[in-house]
Regions:
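A compositional/structural signature for long, glycine/proline-rich flexible linkers
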Residues: 2-382
């Protein structure tokens, strides 16, 4: 009886595998992938989203960026037996509300394996390691699992260190993985990302150390990757758009009313993040005032309607605790405007009449605060 049940199970698995292979061979998998991408485009056209040409163009560009980044993560580098640390969030591949001061690294993992990360720390102001379950941000799963921050790590005087990832406890720097652990995210946060040295990090699966080469691509792996990437692109695009639409109900005001549980569960626990939706006329400015709390690092940045940071390479659309000018009493005043008002801490909207402005307070035990805002005529600031 048991043998028959096992044979039936094996037979069913074989049929499913053969069906998956056939879907790749006859092009069904590719056509379904293209259909998912077409469906993702409906997120851009959904009610509540702006219809002007700039927003629409950036919305559809966002889909291509999400697709590019997720193909790197879920297809090109999705071998947990041979993990690689890759950066798939940067100046031209963005995700909901990413931090311009961060250098993001990630790798595909499998909770049944143990891993070692090693290297040198570099000059980042703040660094964190987060394990994710499921497909990671936007792809489902419980969200952030174990986390590790520098104050709980041993780092040698020369900046070198190692971190072990395993289900069983390990002495030293250790991240507890679970059976459903599927990826890691490493954030390096810089005061001056271009001018400071980045960490030199490496990862290996313990017990392999490069002894066996990666497996060739299989139809099953391609089918799975295309399915995940298609859904990921649609889901993450929807997260950004829906969040902004909700936030726009409270224009030019910081509020947590629009917070999304799906994004909240993928946060690092030491990061406090708040948003406002700016909507300004040509001759208006949004004044943002706050006394930044005591923390390791803080920043402010502008985003478009789709929650992508604006072009911070060619525009001053972000400032941090190192680059901003503070008042004598320790407070900070930022001015969001379409053109330079000739005052300190101008944040350039880079041609965007509306979008979001976000602040981050980062570190352990941060006393959270919300900035105050007011809309003024640009002439009042001259």
């Amino acid at each position: 009886m048991d043998e028959t049940a096992q044979d039936d199970g094996a037979s069913t698995d074989d049929v499913v595998q053969q069906d998956v292979v056939q879907q790749v061979v006859d092009g069904t998998a590719w056509r379904e992938f293209c259909a998912l991408l077409a469906d993702a485009g409906e997120s851009i056209l959904a009610a509540g989203n702006p219809e002007d040409p700039l927003d629409r163009a950036e919305g559809f560009r966002m889909l291509t960026r999400l697709m590019r980044g997720s193909l790197e993560s879920f297809l090109e580098h999705a071998q947990p037996r041979h993990p690689q640390l890759i950066c798939t969030c940067h100046e031209t591949i963005k995700i909901v509300g990413e931090n311009p001061d961060n250098h993001y690294l990630g790798a595909s993992l499998d909770g049944k394996y143990d891993y070692r990360i090693w290297g040198t720390r570099g000059e980042a102001k703040w660094i964190s390691f987060n394990l994710f379950s499921g497909a990671g941000f936007g792809g489902g799963g419980p969200g952030t699992g174990a986390t590790l921050h520098e104050e709980h790590m041993h780092i040698e005087p020369d900046g070198s260190f190692e971190v072990i990832i395993s289900q069983t406890e390990h002495p030293g720097n250790w991240l507890r993985s679970e059976a459903d652990t599927r990826s890691i995210a490493i954030r390096q946060t810089f005061l001056d990302k271009r001018g400071q040295e980045h960490a030199d990090l490496h990862i290996e699966r313990i017990g392999d150390q490069g002894a066996t080469p990666p497996d060739p691509l299989t139809p099953e792996a391609l089918h799975q990757a295309l399915t995940i990437v298609g859904h990921y692109t649609k889901i993450v695009a929807g997260i950004g758009a829906q969040w902004a639409v909700r936030q726009a109900q409270w224009p030019n005001v910081f509020t947590d009313e629009a917070e999304d549980d799906l994004t909240d569960k993928f946060k690092d626990p030491q990061i406090k993040w708040h948003q406002a939706y700016f909507d300004l006329g040509e001759d208006e400015a949004l004044v943002v005032e706050v006394v930044p709390p005591a923390c390791d690092y803080w920043m402010i940045a502008l985003h478009n309607h789709w929650m992508e940071t604006l072009d911070y390479v060619n525009h001053q659309s972000t400032l941090n605790c190192h680059s901003a000018t503070l008042e004598p009493d320790g407070s900070a005043r930022f001015v969001v405007a379409h053109r330079d008002p000739g005052v300190a801490n101008w944040l350039d909207t880079a041609g965007h009449r509306h979008g979001t402005v976000g602040v981050r307070w980062v570190g352990p035990d941060v006393v959270d605060v919300l900035p105050s805002t007011r809309v003024v005529a640009l002439s009042e600031l001259a």
